[in-house]
């Protein structure tokens, strides 16, 4: 291995040398140019640096003259880092291979030149910190630097710390490659030091040991917290050379290095590994190390890194602690990361938690914030990346790391364990880049990467790229990654990278090559240049890196794919994760990382932060730090932001180049001089970019990514215009967002602190710091912006300036606009800052467009936009994400959370509320609120626009405009005009792009020009939202999105506002949409980016056009974005409707399909959205719009369909022509799906749609409930829904058909209601209905849809074909319009699937004739798409989960789709459902359970006969459990599906339900607890009854249960909240809900209850209580009671509901199966048994009186049924003591069970008999629990089923706490669990828990 590694390393080094040589020439020129500037600035910075940190000087020499160590040296370097001085020498002494040496030396020489720049770039403070750490570690780093050469130069430029960083990362790579490598590294680099540093490397036992010991000690000592304090210990041992301050600084760096290097397996692994890290980590994050370096979780040195960051020691002890925490958080998160998905999640979560923590850490770093920032960034990035790098990397390796990075992780995770390791290295490169961004770290990282690259190349060339790639998403392209990895990697890396111009490509290649690039690109040269690029890339990866990745991925070609994923990952996925890494800041990570980080970090950080931390700024910065720093660093520091902007704008690739070393350099450069930067950027970037495939392949995309279309270059130029911050910023405009972003990022004001030290530079990182500026920019922004930002970061400022700086101006606008955002700035700082930052950065990344676009585009470009979005989404979204999740995952949560708080806090602090909320708020629903929100925000941002007012306000300044716009939901109207304007702008947009000045911020709009109206804006918003929440928000928010970024945005915003037009504009948008639409089609998918290749390709092709067109095209992808924008707009319009939705959708959608969809849908979708949104939002326009839209769509049914179809095709882009078919094909084929995947991140195709749908449909709920996974889930949900939606679409398309399709029962009786209700789901008619209704309608629709799915799918497919034929003819804009319409239609379908609103409403009118078509189409669509989508959906599951959070919100579609798609056996699941493979389904459901609580289990499980029905129902249930399940009527009504059929006859109160007669739990083999649950209402009842029947032999039990179910359904409907398991919950959840519902109104329940429950009307049911289930019936008493706590809590309902739900006694038992047994439930331990017995005896002699108070139940046996009945009537709802007794009839079976259980199981057994029934119920529940996993969650306690299932499934909620005993004991005691004493247990009863459970 070592040999291979050595070989690979050598090869890589040679390649790198060559590359470096080549690039050096370029770089030399550039650097020479920059050198002067740098020197000048450096002189100033040096002063600052010196003042801040003395170490840098010490380090610089070493670094400056580091000999190119072998990759192996990297480790030692890393190790060395601990003792920089010595090590540096040692490392330096280690001669790299001659080839390497020379190039490296050359680069080093150059680097020194660069260094000045870097310092300028990175605020001295950061620089110093990093330097310190780096220096110490830098000892080796220098070696690495040598290896990196260029990187080193960069490092040098950055400062020694950078060098160190670079070197270490190389180590990392190497180490990652293998421990041997580490050893080698150690050996190579003064092993003693190295080991020490490395910790992991044992060869250098003394040092290593010392470090380890120190680290361990520290860890043990909780050095983490005191890491800084302990650092010294470490420092002495591990960091001899480090001075305390140096130690700290270095520590950070070291940590970073370590993280990177240490990150290597060993390093990371060992705490020691963290040794170096330790030091680094220790100092910073010993904790990390501690973590096991974190390693465990941090595993990835995330922790370490993070810690490091934290520990940048600025906030030495406290920080570290924080760090620790954070670290831990990271750790934890990291763990997740390790976990893999978690990467994304991690990113999201981690990012959130961790990242933020990280950030915090970073903050802690504070000192290094400048460099630390870098470091942090790096670290953060690094962490993200490093972690990526690291070994966690090693472990999850890339995955993990990436995981950390999240996305990458995601991506990579599996992919490269081994590979990944390297990958991480790669990631480290990313990190490096990041560092670069940050200065040091990036470089450092870069170095690492190169080494890594080398190593990776050696070890895993594939890995590396994989890493990167993988990381990059290579995983998605793992395939690619492999190829890329191995081959490409190396080659790419080397060659391509080289090729790439690698840098440029670097982006492109980079990703692919990344490693190789690094590696190959001779460490020195490649590093230098590549590093530049690469570095940049990594940084970007962080920020750009990912992008780079994108580029990279893309760049190589990879860019597209890889990028997509990679980028996607980073952006999208990565994003999610990395995007986390790469832009982790940007995309996802911003989403994740960024998001998390940013979000969280932002959120958290800011809030937390460490901002406060010593490095307040730091903290904040970090906070932003991540975003900011990270982003900034990544972006900014690296100039990436700017550069990225530029680069992004340029191409991302460009940035890469520019931004890699360039980044570094560029950063430096930027710092040095914008012009130079620009020049360089232009030169390097352009040269590289252009030179590189990047340019060619990537270029369009990159350009697109840049969101600048071709113009991007111009934009670049504009960027170039950068000169004045303003100018630049203006240029930044679109970029601005970017710029802003950077700024924003910087904004993160916390950074300001960082900055504080110098800040401005720090600005860069600091720049973030500059957040002060941010603040400034918030407040001062202008000045800062200009001066401050720009100045502030002079270079960095510049960068930022560029980014922010310009932005600043803009920001000013922002500022102004946002002014505050000043808060933004200020408080926002993060808020905005991050918004912007992230957003911006993102935005930047997105460049707003870029991101947005890129986001989308980039994303797209990596598809990731989507991903990014996803990432954003989420993450998370999708991530986000997941943003991730985020995301979200992201992610969402992270984002969400993060954002949320963040928002609150960080994001905008100021907006904080708003923003957070603002974004958040608005977004709030969304979760990520931030991002999700962002997405939401889009809603927020976007929404903010809608909501935005506040958010806008939140946006503060910006928002102000936004608010105006925001004001808008109506505001959209204003935009409407603008929309019109925009429309022209759209055309213009492209043009405008060229001439941003034209729009000045219109530019941004311009960007958005794509969004014709709010399109651009929205787009941006979306993008921005996503990207830049700030931008978006600002934009969106600010300008309503409309405002655009700032005022400028605002102006555009207006256009955005146009969104109103949005709808009106819709037409236009359609126009536009088509405009971009075409592009959408082309671009759209270019946008797809999901298809990305195609799309982007298309895009590219189209791009120009699109770009031209849009930018349309370009933006087209944006369409996703746009759509996002649209969506967003829509969101906004929707009033935030969708903020999520929009955004989410957008995001999700963003991902191309949606994008497509959105795009078109943007029109249609938007309209729909709007309809929905309006409805939902109740926005004025929406209603109006909706009707028109409905009409329109009806009229255009074709169009509507078309868009939908397009969406479906996901290829709107593709051919514009009906890609729908294609999409189906594509979906069928993974291509599209892959595309989707990329786009969505996971089954993007599915997800996005779902997202959209869910967002839309669920949005309200979603926002409320599940914003969280808006992206992920949303996407997934949307997609699946999309899948389903197509059916809806057909509905939409053939409205009459839909109607015809819809069974008369459903439509006729309900059309109005159901439509209306659907509308609510849709949001279009939403205003008319409450969530409950909507949920019910949703379910109906879903039932319809599900049942019709096959038909619809078939039909859809047919229609799509027809439409595509139709559309195809009009290929081109009109076609696009049509396609857009089809997209819209499709989206609508999707929406309708969710909503069935238009479907029912509009489509219901569709002649039946189409029905058949639809069904088949749907079916084929599902089959085709779903199956293919399945894997993705499976990926999307988490999204589903998110949806699960809001099960109801998920529509059936979501559930169904999710189940079908997301769930692992999507199609088969469908089939299973169809086939009613209960177990299978259940299992599936279990799997899904987390996805969709309801749908999982009960959903399809139930009965084949009703499968369609059930399927629908379940699906519906989950999606809109209330209607469907609870009432069941929705099912009944909505049996639209032919299968659904007649739905079991509606229950009529008083009569036994006749539904599912065929299913007799007793006899039905399929009946399982889950199965029962499947048909919640009916089935469940029945099944429950059957269960009961099984026990009792009577079906009354089941019936009894059912009412609950039914009721639940209702309840659920009511409680939309509980939605998750509508099916699953129906029993359980229902119980819970039922309680609520019933409590509140059990009328329906009652009837249903009677029927379902078969509650003998005569017994209790007949009685007044009969209406509601008896238990619930006692609504009055129980009502309060139930309602009280248990009810809702679950405990409550658990109590009564569960109790009665089993209904065993009351309902069922009573009826038919009345035995002589009476079960008294809901007893509390306080009940006096004797009194109870006396009461019971009043009705007759008691043959048996078994009191099981622990379970809250008692079994009473009378001698006759008459007595039992009498007793039941008397006792039921009898208030005894503090409880209301629920008396139910129990069957003998139940009784036996009850006793058996009481004996065998927990107290539950007492109730066993009852339990029997309940067990059934429980079964149901159980099943539901799966189903309801979410619910379970939601349910937590309430999740009866959760409990059951939990037990069974481990749904931990219930844990099987068995509340039984306790829970049962006091029903209320466990509100969460079924307080009802016995119900749960009864439900869970042994039978079910044991037997039932088993059966489950």
Swiss-Prot record:
The keyword Cell membrane does not apply. Residues 1716-1788 form the RRM domain. Residues 551-1279 are annotated as: Sufficient for interaction with AGO1 and AGO4. Residues 239-488 are annotated as: Sufficient for interaction with AGO1, AGO3 and AGO4. Residues 1-917 are annotated as: Interaction with argonaute family proteins. GO terms for cellular component: cytosol; Golgi apparatus; nucleoplasm; P-body; perinuclear region of cytoplasm; RISC complex. The keyword RNA-binding applies. Residues 69-93, 101-113, 430-443, 858-871, 1143-1163, 1284-1296, 1360-1376 have a biased composition (Low complexity). Residues 573-584 have a biased composition (Gly residues). Interacts with AGO2. Interacts with AGO1, AGO3 and AGO4. Interacts with CNOT1; the interaction is direct and mediates the association with the CCR4-NOT complex. Interacts with ZC3H12A. Interacts with SND1. Interacts with GARRE1. Belongs to the GW182 family. Plays a role in RNA-mediated gene silencing by both micro-RNAs (miRNAs) and short interfering RNAs (siRNAs). Required for miRNA-dependent repression of translation and for siRNA-dependent endonucleolytic cleavage of complementary mRNAs by argonaute family proteins. As a scaffolding protein, associates with argonaute proteins bound to partially complementary mRNAs, and can simultaneously recruit CCR4-NOT and PAN deadenylase complexes. This is Trinucleotide repeat-containing gene 6A protein. It comes from Mus musculus. The lineage of its organism: Eukaryota, Metazoa, Chordata, Craniata, Vertebrata.
């Amino acid at each position: 291995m070592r040999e291979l590694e050595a070989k690979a390393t050598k090869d890589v080094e040679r390649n790198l040398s060559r590359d470096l040589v080549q690039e050096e020439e370029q770089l030399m020129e550039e650097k020479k140019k920059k050198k002067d500037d740098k020197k000048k600035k450096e002189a100033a910075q040096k002063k600052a640096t010196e003042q801040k940190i003395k170490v840098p000087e010490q380090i610089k020499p070493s670094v400056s003259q580091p000999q190119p160590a072998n990759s192996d040296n990297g480790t030692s370097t890393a190790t060395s880092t601990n003792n920089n001085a010595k090590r540096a020498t040692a490392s330096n002494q280690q001669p790299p291979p001659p080839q390497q040496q020379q190039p490296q030396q050359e680069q080093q020489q150059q680097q020194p030149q660069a260094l000045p720049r870097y310092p300028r770039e990175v605020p001295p403070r950061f620089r110093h910190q990093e330097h310190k750490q780096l220096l110490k570690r830098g000892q080796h780093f220098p070696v690495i630097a040598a290896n990196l050469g260029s990187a080193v130069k960069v490092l040098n430029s950055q400062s020694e710390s950078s060098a160190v960083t670079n070197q270490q990362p190389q180590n990392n790579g190497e180490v990652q490659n293998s421990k041997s490598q580490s050893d080698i590294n150690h050996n190579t680099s003064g092993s003693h030091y190295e080991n020490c540093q490395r910790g992991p490397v044992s060869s250098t036992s003394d040092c290593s040991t010392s470090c380890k010991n120190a680290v361990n000690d520290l860890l043990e000592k909780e050095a983490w917290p005191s890491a800084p304090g302990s650092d010294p210990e470490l420092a002495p041992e591990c960091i001899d050379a480090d001075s305390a301050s140096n130690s700290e600084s270095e520590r950070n760096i070291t940590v970073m290095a370590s993280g990177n290097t240490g990150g290597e397996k060993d390093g990371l692994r060992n705490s020691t590994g963290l040794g170096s890290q330790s030091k680094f980590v220790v100092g910073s994050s010993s904790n990390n190390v501690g973590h096991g370096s974190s390693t465990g979780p941090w595993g990835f040195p995330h922790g370490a890194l993070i810690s490091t960051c934290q520990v940048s020691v600025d906030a030495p002890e406290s920080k570290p602690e924080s760090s620790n925490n954070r670290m831990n958080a990271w750790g934890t998160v990291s763990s997740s990361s390790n976990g893999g998905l978690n990467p994304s999640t991690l990113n999201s979560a981690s990012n959130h938690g961790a990242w933020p923590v990280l950030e915090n850490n970073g903050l802690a770093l504070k000192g290094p914030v400048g460099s630390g920032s870098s470091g942090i960034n790096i670290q953060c990035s690094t962490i993200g990346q490093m972690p990526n790098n690291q070994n966690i990397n090693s472990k999850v390796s890339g995955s993990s790391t990436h995981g950390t990075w999240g996305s990458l992780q995601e991506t990579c995770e599996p992919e490269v364990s081994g590979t990944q390791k390297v990958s991480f290295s790669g990631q480290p490169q990313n990190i490096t880049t990041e560092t670069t961004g940050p200065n040091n770290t990036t470089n450092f990282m870069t170095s690492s990467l190169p080494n890594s690259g080398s190593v990776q190349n050696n070890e895993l060339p594939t890995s590396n790229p994989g890493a990167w790639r993988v990381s990059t998403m290579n995983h998605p392209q793992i395939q690619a990654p492999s190829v890329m990895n191995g081959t490409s990697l190396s080659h790419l890396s080397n060659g391509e990278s080289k090729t790439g111009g690698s840098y440029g490509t670097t982006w492109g290649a980079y990703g692919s090559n990344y490693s190789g690039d690094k590696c190959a690109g001779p460490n020195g040269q490649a590093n230098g240049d590549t590093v530049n690029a690469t570095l940049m890339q990594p940084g970007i990866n962080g920020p750009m890196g990912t992008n780079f990745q994108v580029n990279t991925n893309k760049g190589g070609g990879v860019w597209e794919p890889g990028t997509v994923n990679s980028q996607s990952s980073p952006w999208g996925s990565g994003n999610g994760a990395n995007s986390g890494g790469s832009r982790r800041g940007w995309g996802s990570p911003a989403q994740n990382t960024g998001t998390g980080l940013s979000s969280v970090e932002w959120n958290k950080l800011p809030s937390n932060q460490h901002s406060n931390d010593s490095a307040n700024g730091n903290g904040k910065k970090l906070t932003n730090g991540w975003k900011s720093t990270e982003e900034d660093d990544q972006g900014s520091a690296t100039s990436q932001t700017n550069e990225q902007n530029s680069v992004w704008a340029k191409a991302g690739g460009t940035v890469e180049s520019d931004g890699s070393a360039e980044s570094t350099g560029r950063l430096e450069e930027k710092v040095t001089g914008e012009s130079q930067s620009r020049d360089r950027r232009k030169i390097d970037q352009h040269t590289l970019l252009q030179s590189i495939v990047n340019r060619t392949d990537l270029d369009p995309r990159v350009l697109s990514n840049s969101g600048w279309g071709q113009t991007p270059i111009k934009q670049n130029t504009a960027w170039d215009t950068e000169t004045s911050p303003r100018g630049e910023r203006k240029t930044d405009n679109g970029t601005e967002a970017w710029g802003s972003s950077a700024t924003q990022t910087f904004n993160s004001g916390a950074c300001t602190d960082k900055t504080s030290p110098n800040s401005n530079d720090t600005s860069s990182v600091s720049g973030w710091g500059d957040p002060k500026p941010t603040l400034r920019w918030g407040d001062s922004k202008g000045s800062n912006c200009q001066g401050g930002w720009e100045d502030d970061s002079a270079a960095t400022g510049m960068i930022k300036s560029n980014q922010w700086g310009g932005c600043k101006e803009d920001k000013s606008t922002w500022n102004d606009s946002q002014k505050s955002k000043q808060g933004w700035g200020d408080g926002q700082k993060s808020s905005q800052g991050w918004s912007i930052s992230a957003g911006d950065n993102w935005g930047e990344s997105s460049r707003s467009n870029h991101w947005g676009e890129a986001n989308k585009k980039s994303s797209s470009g990596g598809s990731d936009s989507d991903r990014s979005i996803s990432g954003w989404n989420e993450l998370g979204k999708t991530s986000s994400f997941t943003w991730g999740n985020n995301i979200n995952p992201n992610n969402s949560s992270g984002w969400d959370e993060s954002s949320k708080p963040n928002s609150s806090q960080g994001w905008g602090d100021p907006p904080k509320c708003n923003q957070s909320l603002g974004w958040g708020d608005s977004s709030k629903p969304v979760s990520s609120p931030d991002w999700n929100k962002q997405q939401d925000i889009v809603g927020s941002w976007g929404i903010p626009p809608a909501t935005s007012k506040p958010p806008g306000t939140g946006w503060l300044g910006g928002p102000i405009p936004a608010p105006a716009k925001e004001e808008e939901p109506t505001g959209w109207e204003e935009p409407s005009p603008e929309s019109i304007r925009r429309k022209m702008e759209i055309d213009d947009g492209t043009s405008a792009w060229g001439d941003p000045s034209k729009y000045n911020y219109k530019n941004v709009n311009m960007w958005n020009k794509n969004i014709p109206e709010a399109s651009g804006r929205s787009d941006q918003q979306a993008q921005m939202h996503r990207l830049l929440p700030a931008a978006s928000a600002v934009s969106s928010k600010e300008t309503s999105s409309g405002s655009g970024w700032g005022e400028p945005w605002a102006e555009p915003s207006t256009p955005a506002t146009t969104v109103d037009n949005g709808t009106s504009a819709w037409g236009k948008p359609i126009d536009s949409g088509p405009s971009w639409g075409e592009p959408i089609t082309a671009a759209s998918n270019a946008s797809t980016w999901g298809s990305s290749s195609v799309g982007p390709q298309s895009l590219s092709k189209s791009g120009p056009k699109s770009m031209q067109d849009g930018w349309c095209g370009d933006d087209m992808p944006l369409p996703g974005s746009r759509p996002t924008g649209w969506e967003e707009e829509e969101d906004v319009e929707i009033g935030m409707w969708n903020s999520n939705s929009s955004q989410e959708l957008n995001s999700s959608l963003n991902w191309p399909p949606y994008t497509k969809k959105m795009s078109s849908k943007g029109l249609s979708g938007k309209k729909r959205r709007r309809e929905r949104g309006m409805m939902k939002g109740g926005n004025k326009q929406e209603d109006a719009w909706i009707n028109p839209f409905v009409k329109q769509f009806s009229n255009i049914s074709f169009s509507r369909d078309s868009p939908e179809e397009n969406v479906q095709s996901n290829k709107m882009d593709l051919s514009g022509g009906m890609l729908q078919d294609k999409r189906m094909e594509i979906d069928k084929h993974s291509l599209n799906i892959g595309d989707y995947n990329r786009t969505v991140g996971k089954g993007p195709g599915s997800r996005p749609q779902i997202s959209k749908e869910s967002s839309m449909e669920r949005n309200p709920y979603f926002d409320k409930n599940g914003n969280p996974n808006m992206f992920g889930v949303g996407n997934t949900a949307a997609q699946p829904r999309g899948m389903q939606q197509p059916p809806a679409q057909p509905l939409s398309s053939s409205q009459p058909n839909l109607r015809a399709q819809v069974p008369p029962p459903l439509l006729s009786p309900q059309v109005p209601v159901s439509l209306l209700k659907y509308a609510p789901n849709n949001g279009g008619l939403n205003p008319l209905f409450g969530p409950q209704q909507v949920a019910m309608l949703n379910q109906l629709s879903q039932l319809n849809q599900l049942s019709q799915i096959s038909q619809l799918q078939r039909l859809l497919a047919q229609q799509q074909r027809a439409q595509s034929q139709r559309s195809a003819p009009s290929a081109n804009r009109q076609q696009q319009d049509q396609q857009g319409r089809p997209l819209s239609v499709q989206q609508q379908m999707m929406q309708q699937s969710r909503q069935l609103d238009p479907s029912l409403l509009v489509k219901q009118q569709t002649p039946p004739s189409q029905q058949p078509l639809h069904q088949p189409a749907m079916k084929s669509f599902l089959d085709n798409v779903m199956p293919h989508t399945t894997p993705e959906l499976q990926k999307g599951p988490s999204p589903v989960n998110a949806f699960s959070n809001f099960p109801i919100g998920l529509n059936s579609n979501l559930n169904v789709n999710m189940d079908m798609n997301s769930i692992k056996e999507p199609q088969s699941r469908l089939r299973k459902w169809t086939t009613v493979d209960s177990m299978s389904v259940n299992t599936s459901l279990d799997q899904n359970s987390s996805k969709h609580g309801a749908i999982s289990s009960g959903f399809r499980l139930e009965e084949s006969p009703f499968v369609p029905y059930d399927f629908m129902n379940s699906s519906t249930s989950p999606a809109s459990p209330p209607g469907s399940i609870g009432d069941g009527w929705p099912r009944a009504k909505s049996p639209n599906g032919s299968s659904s059929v007649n739905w079991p006859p509606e229950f009529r109160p008083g009569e036994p339900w006749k539904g599912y007669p065929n299913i007799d739990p007793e006899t039905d083999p399929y009946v399982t607890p889950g199965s029962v649950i499947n048909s919640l209402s009916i089935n469940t009842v029945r099944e429950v009854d059957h269960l009961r029947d099984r026990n009792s032999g009577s079906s009354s039990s089941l019936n009894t249960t059912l009412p609950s179910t039914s009721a639940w359904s209702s309840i659920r409907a009511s409680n939309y909240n509980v939605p998750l398991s509508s099916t699953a919950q129906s029993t359980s959840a229902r119980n819970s809900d039922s309680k609520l519902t019933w409590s509140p109104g059990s009328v329906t329940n009652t009837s249903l209850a009677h029927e379902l429950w078969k509650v003998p009307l005569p017994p209790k049911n007949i009685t007044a209580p009969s209406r509601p289930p008896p238990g619930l019936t006692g609504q009055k008493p129980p009502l309060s009671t139930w309602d009280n706590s248990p009810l809702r809590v679950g405990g409550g309902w658990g109590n009564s509901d569960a109790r009665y739900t089993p209904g065993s006694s009351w309902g069922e038992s009573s009826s038919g199966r009345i035995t002589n047994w009476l079960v008294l439930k809901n007893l509390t331990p306080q009940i006096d048994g004797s009194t109870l017995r006396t009461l019971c005896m009043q009705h007759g002699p008691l043959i048996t009186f078994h009191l099981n108070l622990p379970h809250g139940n008692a079994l009473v046996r009378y001698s006759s049924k008459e007595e039992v009945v009498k007793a039941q009537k008397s006792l039921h709802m009898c208030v005894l003591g503090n409880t209301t007794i629920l008396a139910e009839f129990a069957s003998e079976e139940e009784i036996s069970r009850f006793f058996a259980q009481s004996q065998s199981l927990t107290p539950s057994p007492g109730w066993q008999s009852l339990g029997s029934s309940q067990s059934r119920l429980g079964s149901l529940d159980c099943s539901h629990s799966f189903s309801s996993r979410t619910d379970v969650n939601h349910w937590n306690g309430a999740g009866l089923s959760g409990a059951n299932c939990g037990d069974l499934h481990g749904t931990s909620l219930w844990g099987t706490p068995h509340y039984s005993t306790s829970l049962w004991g006091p029903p209320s005691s466990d509100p969460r669990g079924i307080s009802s004493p016995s119900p749960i247990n009864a439900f869970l009863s042994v039978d079910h828990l044991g037997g039932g459970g088993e059966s489950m």
